[in-house]
Amino acid sequence: MPNARTGSLLALAGFGLATAGAALYGARYSRGKRDGWYRDLRKPSFTPPDKVFPVAWTTLHALIAYSGWRVWSAAPSRQRNAALRLWISQLAANAQWSKLFFGKPRPTLALVDVFALEGSIIAYIAAAHKVDRPAAYAFVPYAAWVAFATVLNAEILRLNPQLS
């Protein structure tokens, strides 16, 4: 019979796998797209170099998994369950953005999705804060990055009206 520590490590691995699965789902749509239509778009001057994105997202995905695991590890409660539902919703919205922006490509729908993503992140932070403060704080860099991504998405649409 597994002990509590083993169960906790398995849960952490599960959150890591769920987060990695969402990341891989999104990556399958963005892989190679940066060389196609995206490369030819007008982009704002503050667009980071392509090499920044994998570093940022790897760090953020680790924080996403860690935060979800911390909330899951808290004592069962309605607040914990509400936070976990929000964790799942942000993960789903996160996975959809790359499909909408790069896969379709439908940057206007991607902008709607990223607004929903940011809203679910903020709601998760508020819910997680009631359950486990470090879990909530772990999401702050993610919220900041997604806010930046929202501005970037909106600016790409503004600079490329043919995409609307």
Label each region the model flagged.
Residues M1-S164:
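Short amphipathic, positively biased membrane-proximal segments
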